[in-house]
């Protein structure tokens, strides 16, 4: 990376020269040395990069490591908590909310207040009580990032029917470490249940530790291809959500639906085209998968690509017709 002491030295040196007394003097020589925030962030990025890069080899390493990492940390905490007044509005899907503030965010009511599952932002809002003389209660919401969750991406894209609502029983196939599962747990609430099936043991361990704090999640570390292995743990469910990314995912979903899903129950499937067939275009893959679902008595209701959030992904929502599809 080319470094021009003049450019950085002048700008940072001049700006921060007033306090600390180092900016002006060392500006030209060390590249705006102790600028940044708190006297370190910018410093070692520009400073040592230019002056000490030649001998000792410290320039590049410290520039990338300290300058970059500390900059990122500032961004993470910002957003809704930055002193802005946040108003929570209910989304048209029950159990999902929108936080209106500096930016509009998709949020769910935290089932385990004070606990963050994957480092997501939390927003505390005072809700006035319905009785006179009772102080307002604090309610915590968790930001649901559509870039981290296919289900959130589908909701942002405008899914009409979700089948996941307060009090519902949901079978979640391909739960991984529980990023989306935790939000589904928030949506169904204490009256609902999420049966989270994951085959890999490493994410499975994280899923189990998360489920310890959320009594409505039942983690099942088992292969979703063999639903008979966990049939004694699950009753009939209202909805099957699948994010398994396997070539035979239509068959996996069908097996679980036939065994656990109520008649007229909902099926929500995230399809990743590359995982099923990377030799044809995504639209062809989606069409083939929808046809396979029809053959398994799942009536497709809508299909939605997750374009701004995920590439070559789509969500298909269907209804399970136990008696068969009418021709």
From Swiss-Prot:
Cross-link entry Glycyl lysine isopeptide (Lys-Gly) (interchain with G-Cter in ubiquitin), positions: 150
Record's catalysed reaction(s): L-glutaminyl-[histone H2A] + S-adenosyl-L-methionine = N(5)-methyl-L-glutaminyl-[histone H2A] + S-adenosyl-L-homocysteine + H(+); a ribonucleotide in rRNA + S-adenosyl-L-methionine = a 2'-O-methylribonucleotide in rRNA + S-adenosyl-L-homocysteine + H(+)
Membrane spanning residue stretches: none
InterPro entries registered for this protein in UniProt: Fibrillarin, Fibrillarin_CS, SAM-dependent_MTases_sf
Compartments in which it is found: Nucleus, Nucleolus
Keywords: Isopeptide bond, Methylation, Methyltransferase, Nucleus, Ribonucleoprotein, Ribosome biogenesis, RNA-binding, rRNA processing, S-adenosyl-L-methionine, Transferase, Ubl conjugation
PROSITE patterns given in the database record: FIBRILLARIN
Residues with Omega-N-methylarginine modification: 8, 12, 16, 22, 34, 40, 52, 58, 66, 70, 73, 81
Phenotype for residue 103 to G: In nop1.3; thermosensitive allele showing a decrease in histone-glutamine N-methyltransferase activity upon shift to restrictive temperature
Quaternary structure annotation from Swiss-Prot or TrEMBL: Component of box C/D small nucleolar ribonucleoprotein (snoRNP) particles that contain SNU13, NOP1, SIK1/NOP56 and NOP58, plus a guide RNA. Interacts with snoRNA U3. Interacts with MPP10, NOP58, SIK1 and SOF1. Component of the ribosomal small subunit (SSU) processome composed of at least 40 protein subunits and snoRNA U3.
Protein name as annotated: rRNA 2'-O-methyltransferase fibrillarin
């Amino acid at each position: 990376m080319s470094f021009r002491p003049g450019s950085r030295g002048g700008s940072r040196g001049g700006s921060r020269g007033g306090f600390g007394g180092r900016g002006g003097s060392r500006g030209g020589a060390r590249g705006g040395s102790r600028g940044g925030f708190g006297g370190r962030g910018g410093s070692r990025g520009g400073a040592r990069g230019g002056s000490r890069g030649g001998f000792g080899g410290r320039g590049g390493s410290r520039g990338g490591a300290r300058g970059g990492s500390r900059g990122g940390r500032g961004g993470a905490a910002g957003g809704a908590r930055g002193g802005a007044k946040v108003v929570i509005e209910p989304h048209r899907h029950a159990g999902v909310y929108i936080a209106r503030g500096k930016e509009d965010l998709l949020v769910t009511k935290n089932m385990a207040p004070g606990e963050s599952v994957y480092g997501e932002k939390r927003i505390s809002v005072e809700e006035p009580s319905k009785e006179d003389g009772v102080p307002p209660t604090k309610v915590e919401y968790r930001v649901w990032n559509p870039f981290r969750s296919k289900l959130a991406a589908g909701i942002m894209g405008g899914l009409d029917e979700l089948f996941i609502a307060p009090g519902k029983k949901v079978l979640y196939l391909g739960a991984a470490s529980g990023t989306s599962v935790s939000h589904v747990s928030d949506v169904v609430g204490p009256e609902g249940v999420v049966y989270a099936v994951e085959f890999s043991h490493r994410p499975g361990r994280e899923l189990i530790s998360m489920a310890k704090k959320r009594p409505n999640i039942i983690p099942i570390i088992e292969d979703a291809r063999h639903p008979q292995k966990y049939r004694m743990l699950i009753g009939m469910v209202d909805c099957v959500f699948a994010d398994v990314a396997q070539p035979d995912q239509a068959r996996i979903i069908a097996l679980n639906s036939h065994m656990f899903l109520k008649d007229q129950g909902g099926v929500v499937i995230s399809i990743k085209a590359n995982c099923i067939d990377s030799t044809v275009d995504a639209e062809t893959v989606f069409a083939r998968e929808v046809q396979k679902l029809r053959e398994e008595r799942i009536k497709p209701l809508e299909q939605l690509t997750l374009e701004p959030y995920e590439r070559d992904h789509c969500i298909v929502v269907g209804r399970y017709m136990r008696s068969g599809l009418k021709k």
